[in-house]
Amino acid sequence: AGAATAITAADNGADVIVIERQPAATLRSNTRMSGGIFHCPDKSGNKAALKEYAKAMFSGENIPGKLEGEQPQVSDGLAEAWAEYTPGLLDWMKKQDPKFQAFATPGFKGAAFPTFPGAKDCGYQVYRSSYPDRIPAGFNTPCYNGPKEKAISGEAFWLCLDNGIKTRA
């Protein structure tokens, strides 16, 4: 989130600095160690349905065991932003590095909560980050600090964001 925020802030005229706690050679951020999976609904999906689905997720109203601390009053604005910006996320990532690729993840096809309002028509999709033309069979193929052209998962996601930061330095 910090890298994406820094990139967006820089693109909007802010002077930014990204400070990592760990040395670059041994950096093991959450993004880098993640599965590199990101949510990016299809642009052809129904935007109203996507907003309705996002509101259902963010409000907590449709989740059994809703916590008292959840604040449904903020979910409208969050759902509106989600519906507006997430369908363009894959394009935004490719702007950071044209070599970046992402593949639809069959195990995550469609909405995570299929019974929520808007789930059927929202075009929900989940992608997995990669630099190779295809992802190796093993989901946890090691690629930490390896060559960029072999990076997958969180390493690929992080390298893409890192490239976005470096091109603005």
Provide a role label for each language-model segment:
Residues 21-106, 113-114, 118-121:
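Redox-cofactor-proximal catalytic regions of oxidoreductases
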Residues 82-169:
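Conserved redox-cofactor binding core of oxidoreductases
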Residues 1-55, 122, 137, 142-169:
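Residues forming the flavin
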